[in-house]
């Protein structure tokens, strides 16, 4: 069975050669930033019904993200989605899972989430909000803080 992979054109430009090397029996349906579709490089105006979709990080910077997401949710023959998100609790994924669509995610975002958490912990321990308020008021005043070296943390992730 031939498959049609839906992805953003920006992603295709990055990894298209590797995708093409996977199979000769794979049609590529790429959406550009204006929301236009190209099937195997040619403009495509007909209805789309991909069997596979790749929702990479580019999607969350795309001005046509809603159109792409609608194409995914409206695809009657969709069988598999790869997402860049950590969790699958987003409403779009709940509906796909109920339809039996296979959903895969990766841990590619884990380092940036870890950086964010460490930044939040430092902000809390160093009282960044208090420091910024004093700075905005042009007040110099020492701010007490806790050192991290004597602390133990337990971080629980749900994604």
What is each residue range found by the language model?
Residues 131-159:
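Glycine-rich NAD(P)-binding loop of Rossmann-like domains
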Residues 1-59:
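N-terminal glycine-/charge-rich "phosphate-binding" loop or analogous flexible N-terminal tail
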Residues 5-9, 82, 155-156:
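Active-site-adjacent beta-strand anchor residues
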Residues 44-45, 93-95, 144-146:
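Short secondary-structure boundary/capping segments
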Residues 43-48, 72-75, 148:
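A short, aliphatic-rich alpha-helical micro-motif
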Residues 51-132:
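Phosphate/diphosphate ligand-binding glycine-rich loop within oxidoreductases
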Residues 31-38, 60-65, 134-141:
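Short gly/ser/thr-rich secondary-structure transition/capping motifs
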């Amino acid at each position: 069975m031939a498959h049609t992979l839906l992805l953003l054109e920006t992603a295709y430009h990055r990894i298209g050669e590797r995708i093409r090397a996977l199979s000769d029996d794979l049609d590529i349906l790429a959406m550009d930033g204006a929301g236009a579709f190209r099937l195997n490089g040619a403009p495509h105006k007909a209805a789309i019904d991909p069997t596979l979709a790749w929702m990479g990080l580019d999607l969350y910077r795309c001005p046509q993200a809603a159109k792409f997401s609608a194409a995914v949710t409206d695809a009657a023959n969709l069988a598999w989605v790869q997402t860049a998100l950590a969790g699958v609790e987003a409403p779009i994924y709940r509906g796909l899972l109920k339809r039996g669509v296979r959903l895969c995610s990766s841990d590619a975002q884990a380092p940036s989430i870890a950086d964010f958490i460490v930044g939040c912990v430092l902000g809390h321990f160093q009282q960044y909000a208090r420091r910024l308020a004093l700075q905005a008021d042009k007040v110099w005043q020492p701010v007490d803080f806790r050192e991290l070296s004597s602390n133990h943390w337990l971080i629980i992730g749900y994604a």
